[in-house]
């Protein structure tokens, strides 16, 4: 980003340099105001047509975590419901990958649902597998073609999935 600003300043010496104000990353519950950005992030991360508006109806304070930088949604994690505790989506905006956002969102979901097993499916070649392993998730099943109906045939992502479970007794 610094190189873009420097290029702009060289190209436009008459303009005053912009003052950048940094802000903390905040974590909050999913709200209707976030939905457009969340849907865009999930489409970029997974596939088109994802709609998580119904997550607002199922205890969003226990089942959703949204990471914000100022008003920009930079991450989202969603459980299907407090009873089922299945992670349907966990995504971080491109460029924010090494900011520990996924780690914090996963940590929050686990803490919001104590004593409940948490399950998820992850693409067999997804690097998020390392994150889940660090939290203690264990592989239960390998499912061939799990993502076949969702992924573009040209996608480098594996169409096979591994079902993982975090046991919390």
Feature-to-residue mapping (PLM):
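Generic preference for well-ordered alpha-helical elements
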Residues: 1, 35, 84, 103, ...
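Conserved catalytic-core motifs of GNAT/GCN5-like acyltransferases
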Residues: 3-6, 119-121, 138-159, 163
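A conserved beta-strand-loop-helix scaffold within acyl/acetyltransferase catalytic domains
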Residues: 46-95
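Active-site acidic-Proline motif in GNAT/NAT acetyltransferases
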Residues: 93-95, 99, 124
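Conserved GNAT acetyl-CoA-binding A-motif
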Residues: 111-124, 131, 143
């Amino acid at each position: 980003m610094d190189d873009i600003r420097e290029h702009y300043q060289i190209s436009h010496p008459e303009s005053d340099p912009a003052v950048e104000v940094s802000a903390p990353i905040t974590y909050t519950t999913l709200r209707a105001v976030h939905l457009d950005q969340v849907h865009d992030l999930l489409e970029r991360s997974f596939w088109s047509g994802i709609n998580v508006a119904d997550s607002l109806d199922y205890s969003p304070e226990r089942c959703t975590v949204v990471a914000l930088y100022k008003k920009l949604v930079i991450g989202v994690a969603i459980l299907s419901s407090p009873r089922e505790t299945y992670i349907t989506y966990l995504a971080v905006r491109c460029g924010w990958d090494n900011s520990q956002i996924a780690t914090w969102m996963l940590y929050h979901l686990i803490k919001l649902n104590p004593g409940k097993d948490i399950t998820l499916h992850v693409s067999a070649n997804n690097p998020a597998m390392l994150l889940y392993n660090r939290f203690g998730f264990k592989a239960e099943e390998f499912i061939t073609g799990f993502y076949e109906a969702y992924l573009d045939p040209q996608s480098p992502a594996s169409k096979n999935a591994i079902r993982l479970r975090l046991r919390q007794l």
